[in-house]
From Swiss-Prot:
InterPro entries: Csn12-like, PCI_dom, WH-like_DNA-bd_sf. This is PCI domain-containing protein 2 homolog. Belongs to the CSN12 family. GO terms for biological process: poly(A)+ mRNA export from nucleus; post-transcriptional tethering of RNA polymerase II gene DNA at nuclear periphery; transcription elongation by RNA polymerase II. Coiled coil: none annotated. It comes from Caenorhabditis elegans. GO terms for molecular function: double-stranded DNA binding; RNA binding. The lineage of its organism: Eukaryota, Metazoa, Ecdysozoa, Nematoda, Chromadorea. GO terms for cellular component: transcription export complex 2. Residues 222-403 form the PCI domain.
């Protein structure tokens, strides 16, 4: 896209693009209303209330876009001059409400403008995050922060309702193709304010969208499966999490290393719970060496190594939101160690003392007999070990057939 040399040039370029209203030009125009495009950094673009001036440039081709552009300039003014992200965020909501009322609702037989709408929604999320940071030090910071995200979600949801109610079925004109992008926008907002329960009807709508799914952009499908996989992971639905995250990873472009890395941060723990350990080479390739000792500890049944790895990389795992899940790998690690003990003992009746000896050998000295019995009972209850505890004889009696079934074939809880 050519650089913007002046405010007159800015309006002129938009007007020329509006002469041909197709998806390609919609993508080009979207950059002109982005708060992160190069033009947004130019001082001559930071104009307060430009739309109220009597002498000004205009998008004469389209009055609605003229108003949107003027509001966009006001957003830029509040970001760069007034440094008022709260007003910038509320103005961005005005833009989206205007877009919904005058474009999504009234322009029935076209959808070329959806790339512009996607950009406006993405910027609204970022402005909401910025507004949140502005009030985070206030006494009522948390509630105010949530209100920014909630107002953003409300504006996007209103547009979502408009698009899903579109009766046109053809790919070239239906606004229903915006469903997935808007679902992704709302996924990110609800993750931010911890209201994932509000996503259920949106997920159900995608599940039931039929052949329309093939018309969605692959980039939106990748993002959706990434978010769906994360939600499924936190819901302890490991099979759905694995399926979704694998789809996202395999369909993410090979040169998008940072995005593939983000997907792996959640896919790796899911795979580990299902008994599939990542290779050291994979972890190194995607700069995820924080997992190296975690994986080694789980594979070797070494509780001390696992605990040490979690402690050493606690800040990273907490930032990613997976620390508590990784802590639950202790049960898998206990299982690995107990499987090794059973192989050494070589009988179906294993004294509990043998497990305690093994625990002490790997540096775990704070597990008494009662806690050991509780750990084994939980492993049996979750079907990770086939057998039963004989409290009277202080032994674990394991099944002679497949006493330690594959983790992918048992309950994930």
């Amino acid at each position: 896209m050519p650089s913007v040399r002046s405010i007159e040039d800015y309006f002129g370029q938009i007007e020329s693009l509006l002469y041909r209203q197709d998806w390609t030009n919609g993508e080009k125009i979207s950059k002109f209303v982005s708060t992160y495009d190069e033009h947004a950094q130019e001082p001559f673009m930071h104009i307060e209330a430009y739309g109220s001036r009597s002498k000004r440039c205009r998008v004469s081709e389209d009055e609605v876009f003229d108003e949107i552009v003027c509001l966009h300039l006001h957003v830029l003014y509040n970001i760069h001059v007034a440094q008022d992200l709260i007003t910038a965020q509320s103005t961005q909501i005005q833009i989206i409400q205007l877009f919904n009322k005058e474009i999504l609702q009234k322009r029935k037989d076209e959808n070329w403008f959806l790339p512009i709408f996607y950009r406006l929604c993405t910027d609204l999320r970022w402005l909401s995050k910025g507004a949140e940071a502005c009030v985070s030090g206030d006494d009522e910071g948390d509630s105010n922060a949530n209100s920014f995200f909630e107002s953003a979600a409300k504006a996007i949801t209103e547009c979502y309702r408009t698009c899903v109610s579109d009766v046109h079925a053809e790919e070239g004109t239906t606004k229903k193709v915006a469903m997935l992008n808007m679902t992704n926008q709302l996924f990110q907002i609800y993750f931010q304010i911890n209201k994932l329960n509000l996503l259920k009807p949106l997920i159900r709508a995608i599940d039931n969208c039929g052949s329309l799914y093939h018309d969605f952009l692959m980039s939106d499908k990748v993002a959706y499966n990434y978010f769906l996989g994360r939600k499924a992971m936190f819901d302890a639905d490991l099979n759905l999490a694995e399926k979704s995250l694998l789809y996202a990873f395999r369909n993410c472009p090979a040169d998008s290393m940072s995005n593939k890395r983000k997907i792996l941060i959640y896919l790796i723990p899911v795979k580990m719970f299902l008994g599939h350990m990542p290779t050291s080479q994979l972890l190194h390739e995607y700069r995820l060496d924080e997992f190296q000792d975690v994986v080694a500890g789980v594979k070797d049944g070494n509780l001390a190594q696992l605990d040490g790895a979690l402690a050493a990389n606690e800040a990273f795992f907490i930032k990613c939101g997976i620390f508590l899940m990784l802590e639950k790998l202790r049960m898998i690690t206990f299982r690995t160690l107990f499987k090794k003990v059973s192989q050494i003992v070589g009988t179906a009746q294993i004294p509990l003392d043998a497990f305690q000896t093994a625990l002490r050998f790997v540096g775990v000295t704070d597990v008494d007999m009662d806690e050991l019995e509780c750990i084994i009972a939980n492993l049996i209850a979750s079907k990770k070990i086939k057998g039963y505890l004989s409290h009277q004889h202080q032994k674990l009696v394991i099944s002679k057939m497949n006493a330690f079934p594959t983790l992918s074939g048992v309950s994930s809880n």
